[in-house]
Amino acid sequence: MLFEGLELVSALATLAACLVSVTLLLAVSQQLWQLRWAATRDKSCKLPIPKGSMGFPLIGETGHWLLQGSGFQSSRREKYGNVFKTHLLGRPLIRVTGAENVRKILMGEHHLVSTEWPRSTRMLLGPNTVSNSIGDIHRNKRKVFSKIFSHEALESYLPKIQLVIQDTLRAWSSHPEAINVYQEAQKLTFRMAIRVLLGFSIPEEDLGHLFEVYQQFVENVFSLPVDLPFSGYRRGIQARQTLQKGLEKAIREKLQCTQGKDYSDALDILIESSKEHGKEMTMQELKDGTLELIFAAYATTASASTSLIMQLLKHPAVLEKLREELRAKGLLHSGGCPCEGTLRLDTLSGLHYLDCVIKEVMRLFTPVSGGYRTVLQTFELDGFQIPKGWSVMYSIRDTHDTAPVFKDVNVFDPDRFGQARSEDKDGRFHYLPFGGGVRTCLGKHLAKLFLKVLAVELASTSRFELATRTFPRITLVPVLHPVDGLSVKFFGLDSNQNKILPETEAMLSATV
């Protein structure tokens, strides 16, 4: 017994020594990690590097960021201020909040900072994209791509977008059970991008497979850039390769078949615009361009669409006020038949309350957290030095949350954007859901158009109810969305705004 007791004590002592050694090793390595980045400050500048933590060696604070969601930024902002350092997705990063700080970054493009997304994002989207280009190459690409989102182009997309949304809402209403809104919104925006924007005639079965692959791609766009088996980055690469094969096949088929089209889609405009600027696009450039267009139209628009539906559920008075505006304009139609062509851009621009609703959704539930830049030369920001070579992320969502021009920032209140209050009129950089400066989102008008049409069709043709006891919590990666997708039961409406039972809706859908 004595020897057994001594052996147990010895084992415990050994275990304790190992734990102490590991703890000391972690503490020392973490301290060296902090010193390693502190040594990168610009010695010619007397200002200090922003406060903050670089987390653990190699992984930094990536784990905290993924687990804490919006709490990560807010907790560190409260502790360190509007400018703080961290280490995310394999690189050192300074996160910036506040209109004046963001203005300096956005207006400093090409001389203070240059765009640089995380390595995983750059590699997965591809080198030929607008988002990854800089300088003259970026300016030239924007000129080529800008025609895709011109007033004339948007007018031609509008009837097709309206039909896709009508068909989708009819299918939602005919479904006997509640649907996962976020998942279905992803399918809707993906279908819109493939069918309307790009004009691809992909069979339904192939489209479903392509959607699943694209989901895998998007889920790993913001991942640690570690190319190992079973890593998120490796899954993203594999998804990209599969998508590129599918896109090349669709592009070649589309280029060979030009008959029977009643409008020019985005891919047609892109090819023609490129020729007008004296450049014939290669197949690789076309594949990267279409992949970027789908990415831009898919993830962020699905996020905003889900947020729109969630807020209309939470605020029935807002939905009723929207219906009143549509009724006054003669736009509150029945969902019993397709109404292609009933909406025009000038009609939508005259719906002022609808515009306020969309603006408020984008203020309170901005799909993306912010934008990334790399520092070209050391500069001052909020009393700190921002060293050359570091990365900077300007925070859109937190700038909205802390903007002094907005009253009761956590309250969903579309009237804040009405003519009587116009809270966004003071300060250009307090409200920037689509970024700003020379890299303002090219597709912002298409995104707003889609959301407005969705809101009009929801108000006209649907009643919807939350299918769970409480609303789901929100996560921010890769874009803002409900954790459990938002379970909602939809019902169709007749011409008198009365519910249509699912079985009746199914019969109506079968006859359309």
From Swiss-Prot:
Amino-acid positions noted as binding heme in the UniProt annotation, renumbered to this chain: 441
Superkingdom of the source species = Eukaryota
An example Gene Ontology molecular-function term: oxidoreductase activity, acting on paired donors, with incorporation or reduction of molecular oxygen, NAD(P)H as one donor, and incorporation of one atom of oxygen
* Catalytic EC class: oxidoreductase
As for membrane topology, the entry says: Peripheral membrane protein
Tell me what reaction this enzyme catalyses: all-trans-retinoate + reduced [NADPH--hemoprotein reductase] + O2 = all-trans-4-hydroxyretinoate + oxidized [NADPH--hemoprotein reductase] + H2O + H(+); all-trans-retinoate + reduced [NADPH--hemoprotein reductase] + O2 = all-trans-18-hydroxyretinoate + oxidized [NADPH--hemoprotein reductase] + H2O + H(+)
Subcellular location(s) per record: Endoplasmic reticulum membrane; Microsome membrane
- The main location is endoplasmic reticulum
What Gene3D superfamilies does this protein's entry cite? Cytochrome P450
**Cofactor(s) of this protein:** heme
Q: What does this protein do?
A: A cytochrome P450 monooxygenase involved in the metabolism of retinoates (RAs), the active metabolites of vitamin A, and critical signaling molecules in animals. RAs exist as at least four different isomers: all-trans-RA (atRA), 9-cis-RA, 13-cis-RA, and 9,13-dicis-RA, where atRA is considered to be the biologically active isomer, although 9-cis-RA and 13-cis-RA also have activity. Also has a significant activity in oxidation of tazarotenic acid and may therefore metabolize that xenobiotic in vivo.
Name of the molecule in the record: Cytochrome P450 26B1
